[in-house]
């Protein structure tokens, strides 16, 4: 599988003003853009704009939560984008987290494995063109038929942390989307995916958090805030226990559980930042990103973290691009 170099969107600034920036990404050798959906733009709108504006870019969602839209609504959005960008759209589906699903959207965060599996299975059923009347474990559909039939079926990827979801993405989808892991962690994750794939080549897309700055003290401080925000979410805490990172993070977890946020930040060792956030000179960052690929990643989605106030975002993007290698 060829190496694909991607960037996370939406980019900084207003969406209506990003056409030239998307063209610049392609000029610098980026092949993909992958949308992130949290509390800003939805996963699909930035990609719809890019579908019309920049035909050189492949488009992907990383990710669409399985809970916050019904399965037919997800299928309609997927079909529309796949029809707008034939052969260059990938849908990444995942459980998201209890914070986004339950606390923000008021949807019970129950049976995440089954929910994601059922939505993936529904996607396959919907793109068959047949009318669907079926009881899945976590929802039922009665009489739905997807009326848009794209020229090419979209790639379907599963956002995965631990073994269950990784194997699901290998067995029932076209691959997985991973994030918040080190280049060394990829070897363990890729082994699970490839072991469950029955010899079929699978895509492994990684969101890689990067800050190409040598202002180490400032980067460390900002990165620890990001690590605390994510690694205390149960799904990420469980993932890093599985990865063997409990000795590094247990102090933070204990302080956070006790309600002492200041102590939790102080308990995060610099080693955790070095492992989970790529930082340093642009050349060093490119070398570390290459390690992700060597260990099994096939597609990157770089996420530039503005941890250094002196960092110029677009210079950072250019410095990490294939054209800079």
Predicted regions and their residues:
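Active-site-adjacent structural elements that line small-molecule/cofactor binding pockets in enzymes
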Residues: 1-325
